């Protein structure tokens, strides 16, 4: 089972709101998911991104692959740098 960290669209027509979820890669975009790890609101200024950093790190260490958009959000927040340092730290 390939697991992805991606956006699930919510909200109403023309007023999108997204949840950052961990889901099976075969599941539909707005379908079943394993767990929700954050939210993204593109309508606010500046755009509002909230997520549970510990949960995201845990899923990345388990092998979950972030989508391109989520990867950019995690890089902006510094999570990908922490993950990379933890993964390749000298033991």
Swiss-Prot record:
One of its GO terms (biological process) is translation. The keyword Ribosomal protein applies. It comes from the Bacteria. Pfam families: Ribosomal_S16. GO terms for cellular component: cytoplasm; small ribosomal subunit. GO terms for molecular function: structural constituent of ribosome. Keywords: Ribonucleoprotein, Ribosomal protein. SUPFAM superfamilies: Ribosomal protein S16. The keyword Ribosomal protein applies. Belongs to the bacterial ribosomal protein bS16 family. This is Small ribosomal subunit protein bS16.
